[in-house]
Amino acid sequence: MKNSSIMFVLIVVFLISSSENQKMVGEAKQCKTGWACFGEDACKEKCMAKYKGVGTVTYFPFPPETIIIYCECLYDC
């Protein structure tokens, strides 16, 4: 149980520290960024409002009940 708590904290720190990192993707001049979010609608709205891009959500389940939601935003650079 203690190891899973430590793992959870490390993943949360990683997600927060990597938020707003922008990277080039492919030759189509698209960039991507990501952040921890609170749902699919919030992800899509923030991505569209801030970057005029498309937001997709990835769920990372951790036992017993905690779920981390990560939003990845693809947009034209």
Swiss-Prot record:
Major place of residence: secreted
Keywords, ordered alphabetically: Antimicrobial, Disulfide bond, Fungicide, Plant defense, Secreted, Signal
GO CC, alphabetical: extracellular region
Compartmental location: Secreted
Disulfide bond recorded as keyword: yes
Cystine bridges: 31-77, 43-71, 47-73
The UniProt record lists the keyword Secreted: yes
Signal peptide per UniProt: 1-19
Gene Ontology biological-process entries: defense response to fungus; killing of cells of another organism
Domain of life: Eukaryota
Transmembrane segments: none
Protein family per UniProt: Belongs to the DEFL family.
Protein name according to UniProt: Putative defensin-like protein 187
Gene name in the database record: LCR42
